[in-house]
Design a protein with these regions (language model features):
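Glycine-rich, Lys/Arg-enriched anion-binding loops that position phosphate/diphosphate groups
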Residues: 144-238
Length: 331
């Protein structure tokens, strides 16, 4: 059996989910299966190509829903998991079917897709997830922004955080598929020591320092919200906690950036804010207005690279909205 595993690319939780799914599937479903890993990214336009679903089984983890009959497994935890009302209706109908409901799973209450998948694999199928406790723990910390402080998040002392930097920045399409099996084979510190991994870290740490300097130069902080535009310095990703490292008093941060395949509006909130949940704006709902999505506390919108002005207009509107909703008017 050939299984194609589609995962959220450029994402630590996406890679961890793909690795854990593979372990679970091999142990509980198909011991002799072979696995191929295919990254998915949020971009303007179609997110899926039906022609890519070539496996005897096709799984999607940590990414939006597809109603394709070729999809045999789906796990996600994003509040904005459905591209359309029709997709959500398809999933709800699936839950009434005893076969389909044992293959497609969704719960936005989980911090990471990895921990959600671990819960389903253990409680529904009897899969032992104890050997993967470190992976599950760090997937929750990374995807849930559960770092102790902005300094910890930006200075990245832990192997999982350094792996996250590499996963988010790499341009080698073969790198993450090669990495995925190791995430459930070795401790994360040993994964980081692998020759094909270790050599990537020093230049990325230098790039990370340049990103800190650039965002420090560009960031505009007012009324509880940071805004920065770095579209004239194309980069494939940056540490999303840098704004709060620079302005720990901020509640929200909006970043406009450009990569090889999109212009991105990143819409985030400070994980260490003093604001209560009732004082916070649901960022997923804001992003959905522009075709994006995410979670209540963090989201993003993708535009084609050439539609930079449209992205800038959206970012400007969102900044104005969040500054008007500042939970601490004196800040």
């Amino acid at each position: 059996m050939k299984v194609r595993v589609f995962y959220h690319d450029k994402c630590f939780d996406g890679a961890c989910s793909a690795s854990l799914f593979t372990r679970f599937h091999r142990a509980m479903v198909a011991p002799d299966a072979t696995y191929e890993f295919c990254g998915l990214v949020h971009r303007a336009g179609a997110l899926f190509q039906e022609a890519d679903f070539l496996g005897d089984e096709n799984a999607i983890v940590d990414f939006k829903y597809s109603a394709s009959p070729r999809i045999t497994w789906w796990f996600d935890h994003h509040e904005s998991a459905f591209l359309s009302a029709e997709d959500e209706a398809h999933f709800r109908a699936c839950q009434q079917d005893p076969v389909c409901s044992r293959r497609r799973f969704f719960d936005p209450n989980y911090v990471s897709c990895t921990s959600f998948l671990a819960h389903i694999a253990s409680t529904r199928f009897g899969f032992d997830v104890a050997p993967y406790a470190e992976l599950i723990h760090w997937a929750d910390i990374v995807d849930g922004a559960r770092y102790e402080s902005p300094q910890s998040a930006v200075e990245m002392p832990a192997p999982a955080m350094q792996l996250t930097l590499i996963i988010e920045a790499t341009q080698d399409q073969a790198f993450v598929p090669r990495l995925i099996p190791l995430l459930t084979e070795l401790p994360l510190a040993e994964v980081l020591e692998q020759p094909f991994v270790a050599g990537l870290l020093p230049p990325l740490l230098e790039q990370h320092q340049r990103a800190i300097s650039l965002i420090r130069e560009r960031a505009e902080y007012r009324d509880g919200t940071i805004f920065f535009d770095i579209t004239d310095h194309p980069m494939e990703g940056f540490n999303k906690f840098i704004p709060y490292y620079l302005y720990p008093q901020a509640t929200y941060a909006i970043g406009l950036s450009r990569s090889s395949f999109r212009t991105k509006v990143a819409v985030g909130s400070n994980p260490w804010t003093r604001a209560t949940e009732s004082q916070m704006v649901n960022l997923a709902k804001i992003c959905e207005r522009y075709g994006g999505g995410g979670h209540a506390r963090v989201g993003a919108i993708s535009f084609p690279p050439e539609r930079g002005e449209e992205a800038r207009a959206a970012a400007t509107t969102i900044v104005q909205e969040l500054r008007a909703a500042n939970p601490f008017p004196s800040a």
